[in-house]
């Protein structure tokens, strides 16, 4: 149900007497545990490899292929959770907002739309791969089994990261 609107920004509702198309342009944020018990990689994990495989297969490959970023987040140990003074200091929300707005403005000025809306041809023109990036992408394709769709999504994310850094081109 999510694949079509994620790809096209529209959803078609079909009933016996008619079909209606609705706009469905949205950003999907999702989270899931790494395994059914949630403790994968920890001695508390009780899941078998088969249970983990079945759990992860609940989300279809084509849907996973349409999710741009996959991030594994490690658990915070109790000492660090209780002792906030050891937490790394990052950018403030205001600083992040300014960088994101500047990156978005940069995209609109350069190409008249945000990077997520670029076609494959457009992203290839705006995200040229030098030899080092080409080697890195080849390794990523081999290691993660990227589809063509996945390849272009990586380029769009790379272009967006370059925009956040106010860089003309993505860097490896």
Show where each model-derived region lies:
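Basic, amphipathic alpha-helical bundle interface domains used for macromolecular binding and assembly
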Residues: 2-172
